[in-house]
Amino acid sequence: YFTSTMSFARMMMSGAALPLVFGSFILTIVGIVMMSAAASKQSVGLSLVGYVIFASTFGLTASFGLANYDLPTINAAFIATAAITFVFGALGVTFPKFFQRVYGIGFGILLATILVEIVLMFMGVSQSITDLIVIVVFAGFIGYDTYVATTVPPTLPNAVLMASNLFVDIINVFLRILNILGRRD
């Protein structure tokens, strides 16, 4: 609700949003660290607190981007993301060894792509190709994380961590598809 109010829009226009975005990013990382620690200690309370911090701050950060698109574009991105999630989730369970082998390669490609995006951002160059690369990499991560979710002991802290890992993968695919579809309008 807060992100749809006029006072929020004025704050964004005034440039006061940078500390909010930076703080939200830091808290998102804190939530991820808490969930990881909770999974290793099997602490339900720490896991849930980490999840609340992660989900609320990540959602706040994502809402900044969603405000720039119309509903048909968001709907199309949602449908495409759901299809990718279904297909790569099924592939992750069907071909786990493949996803185990390519996980490290995908992570390396992701880091290289982030560095390239930073350079391209300062050069003012279109990043459509990097959007496609990130979609492919995170689709692979969806397969890998789906596979991993089937191998960990079925406890609440593990479930929260695995769901959060998949959420990050899915939201990254969604935001990149949204970015590509939004350029067509």
Describe the predicted segments one by one.
Residues 1-185:
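A hydrophobic alpha-helical transmembrane-helix feature that marks the membrane cores
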